[in-house]
């Protein structure tokens, strides 16, 4: 008797084939892929994010194994993604810079109802007015939470706005159903991004969030320092050379005045200095030698003039001010 080996081929569902084909196409046509953990994430909030990203990015929620097959089909190194393809994920396809996309998402504060154990993201205030809750056992709950109430027309009315939790506080479990009844959502919802893959580079999700103010200040400081160095070394750029030429002129005039070199610009300073020295010499010997002339008091430089002179020296030491530097920043870097 001859044994026959029967081979059966499992038919792959058409929706899976279509899903992989769609994912493969998206992987080939977008430079940035973001993988986000959506475990416990409300479906309605994901829909809100999808609407906000319309025109910027596409969001797909699919099985990890189908995404992995699509990665292979699109020519990606699947090993780069292995550790992130666990649990329920959403896959975001975009050509927008991932940092810009994260900044865009962070501007929208999506909220959800509180669950027992949640911490408040903002101050939770129960407003005064009709709660719509029938009087009965719930009155003791309000009393426990120190919320002043009265019963009117068989309903519980809150007498005054009452804070039941501050940011960072755990929301009392007893208040959770009341908050839901009143339509109060005190917990923010945001996508937990695992990684972004941008032009061949894996960026961990926690590195995508940047403080824009701090970042701007750092760039400004770097700009100012670069401009100061450029001014010091006389970097040949028009805006830099304006400051460099001014500084060189001041130094040249100071040197010329010091050595007594007379030009139209230095003549007054040279002669003034010579007169001052002559007064000083005459005053020092007038008591010992009869000069045949009366030595008048040496002209005094006013305190205000002296202060201005000191300020000028200080300015020369410091170089251009931050305001002056700020005006030349964009020119220095081609802006």
From Swiss-Prot:
Report the record's Gene Ontology biological process terms. cytoplasmic translation; ribosomal large subunit assembly
- Per the UniProt record, one Pfam family is Ribosomal_L10
The lineage's top-level taxon is Archaea
Q: Which UniProt keywords apply?
A: Ribonucleoprotein, Ribosomal protein, RNA-binding, rRNA-binding
Q: Any keyword rRNA-binding?
A: yes
Indicate, by first and last residue, each region the UniProt record lists as having compositional bias (Basic and acidic residues).
Answer: 305-321
**Cross-referenced InterPro entries:** Ribosomal_protein_uL10, Ribosomal_uL10, Ribosomal_uL10-like_insert, Ribosomal_uL10-like_insert_sf, Ribosomal_uL10-like_sf, Ribosomal_uL10_arc
Where is it found, in Gene Ontology cellular component terms? cytosolic large ribosomal subunit
Is the Ribonucleoprotein keyword given for this protein? yes
Q: GO terms for molecular function, please?
A: large ribosomal subunit rRNA binding; structural constituent of ribosome
Quick one: where's region Disordered? 300-335
The residue ranges flagged as biased composition, category Gly residues, are 326-335
**What is this protein for, i.e. what is its function?**
Forms part of the ribosomal stalk, playing a central role in the interaction of the ribosome with GTP-bound translation factors.
Family according to the record = Belongs to the universal ribosomal protein uL10 family.
- Assembly notes: Part of the 50S ribosomal subunit. Forms part of the ribosomal stalk which helps the ribosome interact with GTP-bound translation factors. Forms a heptameric L10(L12)2(L12)2(L12)2 complex, where L10 forms an elongated spine to which the L12 dimers bind in a sequential fashion.
* NCBIfam families in the record: PRK04019.1-1
Q: Which HAMAP family match?
A: Ribosomal_uL10_arch
Additional free-text comment from the UniProt record: Was called L10e in this organism; in this case 'e' is for E.coli-like, not eukaryotic-type protein.
Identification of the protein by name: Large ribosomal subunit protein uL10
Q: What is the lineage of its organism?
A: Archaea, Thermoproteota, Thermoprotei, Sulfolobales, Sulfolobaceae
Instruction: From the UniProt record, report the name of the gene that encodes this protein.
Output: rpl10
